[in-house]
From Swiss-Prot:
Putative transcriptional regulator; part of the gene cluster that mediates the biosynthesis of polyesters containing 2,4-dihydroxy-6-(2-hydroxypropyl)benzoate and 3-hydroxybutyrate moieties, such as talapolyester G, 15G256beta and 15G256beta-2; as well as to oxidized derivatives such as 15G256alpha. SUPFAM superfamilies: Ribonuclease H-like (SSF53098). Residues 756-769, 797-809 have a biased composition (Acidic residues). PANTHER family: ZINC FINGER BED DOMAIN-CONTAINING PROTEIN 39, ZINC FINGER BED DOMAIN-CONTAINING PROTEIN 4. This is Putative transcriptional regulator tpeD.
C-alpha cells in the first residue's frame, strides 16, 4: 500500500482516542477508494492490560481544539465546578489534586489564551485565541509564561497561518449550530423559569403576587426592545440617587419656616453592626402627619452622648434643618442626656436666627415599660433571661420552689414552655391535643421584649385546657396548674393589661400623641399603685419641660382644653399656670402672623360670595383683612365647648378661625410622645439584615433603609404577607395574637379570656394582702419625691366581703410581700397635683 493510500485510510477513520468526531470526517474529501479490510485469518494473540474507565466530560463543557479537532475541554469561570469535578477524575488531575485553572494571572498574555485540558488524559494546556495553537500550561511543571509571550509576540505570522476553509456551507451550518438557541415561549417553559428563579434565589413563593414584581414585568412588556439588565454596581449607584431625590421631595412638604420634631434610637444588627436611626415628624400644609427617615447612620467606637450628638448634628446639617428642630424624643438611657446637652451647646454656638431651645421628650412607651418592670420586679416575677431558653433538664423540673405563691405559678408556665418547645416530638404531641385552628404552642417571656410576660400569660390562659390535658396525659403532674394558680394568672393579666394596651397603642399609632401624655399618666395611676413611684418620678419631670409643652399640647386637643385641669384632681393654680404658659408661648406666633398680614393679600382670596365689583372698588382692601389677636383666639377657643375629635383634624378645619393658635398647634402636635416609630423601623431593618445578606456593608444598609422609608416606615399589607414567608407559623401567629389581644382589650364590652380581679377578692384575707411593706423613711421619701403633681387623697375605706363572695379564690400568696406590719388599707393609686401647702405642718382631715 502506498503512502498516499495509508494517509487517506487514516483520514477516513476516526482517531483512536475513544471518541467520534463527525466534523473531521465530513470535511475530508472522498476519492472513491475501497475501505480497508483486515485479514481475519490472522490468529496471533496479544494480552493487553485493561485501562481504567475514563469519565467522559459533562455535556455542559465545551469541546475545542485546533483545525476543528475538538480533543480538548474549555475551562471558564461559569463552568468551573463541573470542569474541576471532571478534571480531578482524569489521570493528570488525580495526580495534581488541586485546581490550577482558577487563579490570579498577572501576566498580560493570559488575556489572549484559553485554558483547556485534553479529553484523553486531562493534561492541562493553553490555547491561543487567534489560531487555536496549543501550548503547555504554565502551571504544569512550573514552565512559566515565556512560551505564551513568544507565541503572542509573533501573532501576525500566526494569524496568516490559519487555513481558510473553502466549505462555506459547512461554516454556516457550524455557526448556526454553535449559536445560542432561544427557548420558544410556552406556558410550561414560563412556569419552569419562574419556579427555577424563585427556588434558586431562595425567595418566597408569594413573590409572584407582590404588586411591585407584577409592575416590573408589565414595564418590561411595554419596552420596544428587550430591556438590558444593569449590573449590581449600577443599581447600587442609582439607589443612592433615588434616596436623595425622595428625601428632598418629602422635606419640601415642610412649610417655609415651620418646625419639625425628631426621634432617635440606636440599634445593633444581627451582624453586630451599630446604627443610629433619626426620624422626623411634621405636619404639612394640608395637616397630614408626616414621618421621614432622616438618617440611618453607622456607628463606631463607644456610643457616648458627645459622639452621638456629633452624628445627629451631621444629619441635621446634611438636610439643612438645624434651626428647625422643636423637640427630640429619646429613651431614658443616660447618654441621651449628654447628647441633648451637647446638641444644645452646638446649636447655640452657631447663633442661628430666632433659635428656640430644643426640648428633650422622654419616650412614653419606655416609661410605661419601666414602671411595669418595677412592679414585676417588686413581685419578683420579672424574667431573668434575655432570650427564650431551648435547653431542658430534669434538674430544671426538680428546681421548683416549694411555696405555692405567684412566683411558682409563673415558673411553672415558663418551664412548661421550655419543656414543650425543646423537643419536636413534645411540640407535636401538644399540637395534636388541639382540635381547632390555629394550633399554638406555649411562649416564654424574655427580659428584653416589651409586654412579653403579658403575652406569655395570655397565650397560657388561651391554652388552659390543653395545658391541663397535656400534663395529665404525658406524665407531667408537677407542671400542671391548679385552679388557684390559674386564678393567679388572671390576677397578673389584670395588672399588666393597661400597660400592654397603652404600649401597643403608642407603638402602632401614626397620629399626633403629645396631647395624650397626661391622660395616660392619670389612667395608670388610677389603675395601679404598686408602680406609682416610678410613674411619679417621670410624671414630676413634665413640669421641667420647657414652656409646659405637655400642658399646651393637652389644651390644644379639642376634647381637653382647660376642662382637663378643672377636675377635683387638679389644684386651681395649675389651671391658671397652664393658661399663662399658653399665652406666653404663643407670642412669637402672633408676631409672625402679624408680619404676614402686612404683606399684600390678593383680594380675591378673601372675597365672600355675592360681593360685586363696584363694592370691591369702593371698599378698602385692608378693611377686608381678618383681624385677630392671640388673646382673643385663646378666649374664644377656651370659651367654646369641648369636642371629641382628632386634634389634627380639628385644627385643619379651624385654621382660619384661629390662625395664630393653629400655627402653634401645627408645631406642638408634631412632637411624638414615644419613639415607637423608630422601633417599627428596626423591625424592617431586621428583614434587610437577613442572614443570607451578611456581606452587606453598613453604608449599603443605610441606603436601603433610607430608600425603603423615604415615604413611610411600615410595609403595606401585601408586603407584610410577603414577609410572612420568611417567618415560621408560630411567629406569624404570635404577631396576629398580639394584634387580636389589643383589639379585644380595646373593645368596651368584650368578654376577656380571663376574669378580672374584683376589689372584694383583693381584700379577702389580711394574711394574703399584696400591699408592699413600707418603712416610715420610705414613705416620707416617696411623699417628697414621687407624690407627683396632684394632692394626695384620703385612703379609701376597706371593702368588706358580702355573703356571696365566700367562694371566691383568694389573692395569690407571695411570701416575699407579707410582713407583720401589712394591712389591708391601701392608698389611692392616683397622684394628683400637689397644692402649695407648707410641708412643715401636718394637716388633719376635718
Amino acid at each position: 500500500m502506498s503512502h498516499s493510500q495509508c494517509t487517506q485510510i487514516s483520514d477516513n477513520y476516526p482517531p483512536s482516542l475513544g471518541i467520534s468526531d463527525d466534523t473531521s470526517v465530513s470535511l475530508c474529501p472522498s476519492d472513491g477508494l475501497q475501505p480497508f479490510t483486515p485479514d481475519l485469518t490472522y490468529t496471533h494473540q496479544f494480552n493487553f492490560t485493561q485501562p481504567a474507565p475514563l469519565l467522559p466530560p459533562p455535556e455542559t463543557l465545551e469541546r475545542v481544539g485546533p483545525r476543528n479537532k475538538k480533543i480538548y475541554v474549555l475551562w471558564t469561570e461559569m463552568v468551573n465546578d463541573d470542569f474541576v469535578t471532571w478534571w480531578l477524575s482524569t489521570e493528570y488531575g488525580s495526580q495534581m489534586k488541586r485546581n490550577i485553572f482558577e487563579g490570579k494571572h498577572q501576566s498580560e498574555c493570559w488575556q489572549h489564551f484559553h485554558q483547556v485540558a485534553a479529553i484523553q488524559d486531562g493534561s492541562p494546556k493553553v490555547m491561543y485565541k487567534v489560531c487555536n495553537h496549543i501550548l503547555s500550561h504554565p502551571a504544569d511543571r512550573h514552565r512559566g509564561t515565556s512560551s505564551m509571550n513568544k507565541h503572542y509576540s509573533s501573532g501576525v505570522n500566526c494569524r496568516k497561518s490559519v487555513p481558510v476553509s473553502k466549505d462555506i456551507k459547512r461554516l454556516i451550518q457550524d455557526g448556526m449550530h454553535s449559536a445560542p438557541q432561544k427557548t420558544h415561549y410556552t406556558a410550561k417553559a414560563w412556569m419552569e423559569r419562574l419556579v427555577t428563579f424563585i427556588t434558586t434565589s431562595r425567595l418566597p413563593f408569594q413573590l409572584v403576587e407582590y404588586p411591585q414584581f407584577r409592575a416590573l414585568i408589565e414595564m418590561a412588556q411595554r419596552a420596544p426592545l428587550l430591556p438590558i439588565l444593569p449590573c449590581a454596581k449600577t443599581i447600587r449607584n442609582h439607589l443612592q440617587e433615588l434616596v436623595q431625590e425622595r428625601q428632598k421631595s418629602l422635606l419640601q412638604k415642610l412649610s417655609q419656616g415651620a418646625k419639625l420634631s425628631i426621634a432617635l434610637d440606636c440599634w445593633t444588627s444581627p451582624f453586630r453592626q451599630s446604627f443610629m436611626a433619626v426620624t422626623g415628624y411634621f405636619l404639612d400644609v394640608d395637616w397630614n402627619y408626616r414621618e421621614i427617615l432622616l438618617g440611618f447612620e453607622p456607628l463606631s467606637g463607644s456610643h457616648t452622648g458627645a459622639y452621638l450628638s456629633t452624628v445627629l448634628q451631621q444629619v441635621l446639617e446634611e438636610h439643612q434643618i438645624e434651626a428647625r428642630i422643636l423637640t427630640v424624643t429619646t429613651d431614658n438611657a443616660a447618654n441621651n442626656s449628654t447628647l441633648m446637652n451637647s446638641l444644645s451647646e452646638s446649636l447655640q454656638s452657631i447663633e442661628l436666627p430666632n433659635q428656640i431651645p430644643v426640648i428633650h421628650i422622654p419616650c412614653m412607651a419606655h416609661i410605661i415599660q419601666l414602671s411595669l418592670n418595677e412592679l414585676l420586679g417588686r413581685m419578683e416575677v420579672n424574667p431573668r433571661n434575655d432570650r427564650e431558653e431551648i435547653e431542658w433538664t430534669e434538674r430544671d423540673k426538680s428546681a421548683q420552689p416549694e411555696n405555692q405563691d405567684i412566683i411558682h405559678t409563673l415558673e411553672k408556665i415558663r418551664r412548661l414552655a421550655v419543656f414543650i418547645n425543646r423537643s419536636p416530638q413534645r411540640r407535636e404531641n401538644f399540637l395534636y391535643l388541639q382540635s381547632k385552628e390555629p394550633k399554638l404552642v406555649p411562649i416564654q417571656d424574655v427580659r428584653t421584649r416589651w409586654n412579653s410576660t403579658f403575652l406569655m400569660l395570655y397565650r397560657a390562659r388561651k391554652l388552659q385546657s390543653t395545658f391541663d390535658e397535656y400534663c395529665s396525659e404525658y406524665g407531667q403532674p408537677d407542671l400542671k396548674l391548679t385552679k388557684e394558680e390559674w386564678r393567679q394568672v388572671d390576677y397578673l393579666l389584670s395588672i399588666t393589661k393597661p400597660f400592654f394596651t397603652f404600649t401597643t397603642s403608642l407603638s402602632q399609632t401614626k397620629e399626633v400623641t403629645i396631647h395624650s401624655v397626661f391622660a395616660i399618666y392619670n389612667y395608670l395611676f388610677t389603675h395601679l399603685e404598686k408602680s406609682k413611684e416610678k410613674l411619679s418620678e417621670y410624671y414630676a419631670m413634665t413640669d421641667h419641660v420647657g414652656g409646659d409643652l405637655y400642658a399646651i399640647g393637652t389644651i390644644l386637643a379639642p376634647q381637653n382644653k382647660l376642662e382637663f385641669f378643672s377636675t377635683s384632681e387638679w389644684e386651681p393654680e395649675w389651671r391658671v399656670r397652664y393658661r399663662k404658659s399658653l399665652e406666653e408661648y404663643i407670642v412669637p406666633y402672633e408676631k409672625r402672623y402679624s408680619e404676614t398680614q402686612t404683606q399684600s393679600i390678593p383680594i380675591r382670596q378673601i372675597l365672600t360670595g355675592g360681593i360685586s365689583d363696584i363694592d370691591m372698588l369702593v371698599t378698602a382692601a385692608t378693611s377686608l383683612q381678618p383681624r385677630t389677636t392671640a388673646h382673643d383666639e385663646i378666649s374664644r377657643y377656651l370659651g367654646s365647648s369641648t369636642q371629641l375629635m382628632n386634634p389634627r383634624i380639628f385644627w385643619k378645619d379651624h385654621q382660619f378661625k384661629y390662625p395664630i393658635l393653629a400655627s402653634l398647634a401645627q408645631y406642638i402636635l408634631t412632637t411624638p410622645a414615644s419613639g415607637s416609630g423608630v422601633e417599627r423601623l428596626f423591625n424592617s431593618a431586621r428583614d434587610i439584615c437577613h442572614y443570607r445578606r451578611g456581606s452587606l456593608k453598613p453604608h449599603t444598609i443605610k441606603e436601603l433603609m433610607l430608600f425603603m422609608c423615604t415615604t413611610k416606615f411600615d410595609l403595606e399589607s401585601e408586603e407584610l404577607s410577603l414577609m410572612d414567608e420568611y417567618l415560621t407559623t408560630q411567629e406569624i401567629q404570635r404577631a396576629r395574637e398580639e394584634r387580636d389581644a389589643q383589639q379585644a382589650l380595646e373593645a368596651q364590652n368584650t368578654k376577656y379570656d380571663f376574669d378580672p380581679i374584683s376589689d372584694s377578692e383583693e381584700a379577702e384575707s389580711e394574711d394574703e394582702s399584696l400591699v408592699l411593706p413600707q418603712s416610715p423613711q420610705a414613705s416620707q421619701a416617696r411623699s417628697q419625691r414621687s407624690l407627683g403633681k396632684r394632692p394626695a387623697r384620703e385612703e379609701e375605706p376597706l371593702i368588706e366581703l358580702d355573703g356571696n363572695e365566700e367562694d371566691e379564690v383568694p389573692l395569690p400568696y407571695n411570701r416575699h410581700l407579707v410582713t407583720v406590719s401589712s394591712t389591708q388599707r391601701r392608698s389611692s393609686g392616683r397622684q394628683p397635683k400637689r397644692s402649695k401647702r407648707d410641708e412643715d405642718f401636718v394637716y388633719e382631715t376635718p
